[in-house]
Amino acid sequence: MADATLTELQALLGRLQAAQRELIFTAARAAMMPADGTLRRISDLENTIAAVEALIHEQRPGKGA
């Protein structure tokens, strides 16, 4: 995989993590249980983050990609 693509994946990972972090902080500041939709978005982001991390790991030089 080209270095540019790896850089793009890393940038995407950073954006996903920032979005998830903001949702979690917002939920923590609320005085009640987060809405189901918020919990689902946090969970969906976690799954997407894991997928992007796996892709980055697979595509790093020396990983047999």
Labelled PLM ranges:
Residues 19-22:
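A short, structured beta-strand/loop element
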Residues 24-65:
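Short, charge-rich amphipathic interface segments used for partner binding and complex assembly
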Residues 1-17:
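Short, charge/polar-rich alpha-helical segments
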